[in-house]
Amino acid sequence: MALLEICCYSMECALTAQQNGADRVELCAAPKEGGLTPSLGVLKSVRQRVTIPVHPIIRPRGGDFCYSDGEFAAILEDVRTVRELGFPGLVTGVLEVDGNVDMPRMEKIMAAAGPLAVTFHRAFDMCANPLNTLNNLTELGITRVLTSGQKSDALQGLSKIMELIAHRDAPIIMAGAGVRAENLHHFLDAGVLEVHSSAGAWQASPMRYRNQGLSMSSDAHADEYLRYVVDGAAVAEMKGIIERHQAK
């Protein structure tokens, strides 16, 4: 049966995902940045309360995946922290300036991760040559690759995803970006074994007093009284679709 991973941005969201049938959680901070390394407090809280596998993302900032020496040092420290806390896996990725996998740095990450399952995230979708990159990741011992098939969403990239899945000895290929209940059957029918979804919704803040003339964001037009949360009903719906597909 296909595995359902839900992207979560808080302990509460991780619990919601677990309660509604998620098989695994990718734990992040900063949804508007596409996911950054969670704080130590969030990591510890989730480790204590969530019982399904949780893989934290290790990404020090938004933007591209070519990092300074200081940023890479922080990545290694975060990898060691996640390992010490007892998480079963993590999610990360580093590229060179030419769009290829930074093999020396990824080798250091793999050594620091030790027995943890390492997912190479959507840095893969920004690489210059996906098949060469897949060979590199196979050589590194990466467990899985999260990809949209180098398109803006995974449904558009499904043909490339299937090409990657067919690649001999490849890591697990997990489809992600725009995967939701209404298009999930396309991935299941194609034989995708792992899918990644935010199953998210924007929820109004409980704040009653609101200073509308002031923003804490660099985007002056951002609505800071909305919070991104996991929609438990959406997770349950996707899990039900997977189970019914398996029963066919």
UniProtKB/Swiss-Prot annotation:
Localization terms from the record: Cytoplasm
Main subcellular location of this protein, as a coarse class: cytoplasm
Superkingdom, natural source: Bacteria
Keyword Cytoplasm found: yes
Intrachain disulfide bonds: none
Gene Ontology MF annotations: copper ion binding
The UniProt record lists the keyword ATP-binding: no
Family, similarity comment: Belongs to the CutC family.
Subunit structure, interactors included: Homodimer.
Protein name in UniProt: PF03932 family protein CutC
Species in which this protein is naturally found: Escherichia coli O1:K1 / APEC
Phylogenetic lineage: Bacteria, Pseudomonadati, Pseudomonadota, Gammaproteobacteria, Enterobacterales
Gene that this sequence comes from: cutC
